[in-house]
């Protein structure tokens, strides 16, 4: 049980996919202008990442390995992720039309979010079992959501701040992301595996 908690903590904080592995930067920079949108995107991505990790494990274990078709892994994972994202999009559209409008193009873009595919591929390469695969995906999703919401809150504060003209826009956003990455480096050594 402790190993599972450490797995979640290490994927969320220490090996954060956005700040350490630089995966998922497109939604990180694009959806992080308002906290409400970031929370919605974080929830949708959490669902997709967790289910995609489970699905990737099942497809790899029960379809690709028995058929000796591991060379199709990336293509099959992209198709599985696309199906999961479409289901998520339908659920969000039915349950929260406002959130659906706020997320706009970023919801279908979860399909091409490199973090989702990256987590699925890393899960397979790490040879995690079923529970570890789901927890790895969930921890990665928690880390993504945490960073996204924190970054959105910082960007809202920066929008109200008196930022010098050369640093306005993407410049201050990238500087802030770099400082967040440095702050998350403080978690290094938190978990010894």
Curated annotation (Swiss-Prot):
Listed Pfam families: Rnf-Nqr
**Coiled-coil region:** none
Keyword Membrane among UniProt keywords: yes
* Membrane topology label: Multi-pass membrane protein
Q: Which InterPro entries match?
A: Ion_transpt_RnfA/RsxA, NqrDE/RnfAE, NqrDE/RnfAE_oxidrdctase
Give the top-level enzyme category. translocase
Q: What is its EC number?
A: 7.-.-.-
The similarity comment for this entry is: Belongs to the NqrDE/RnfAE family.
> What's this protein's name?
Ion-translocating oxidoreductase complex subunit A
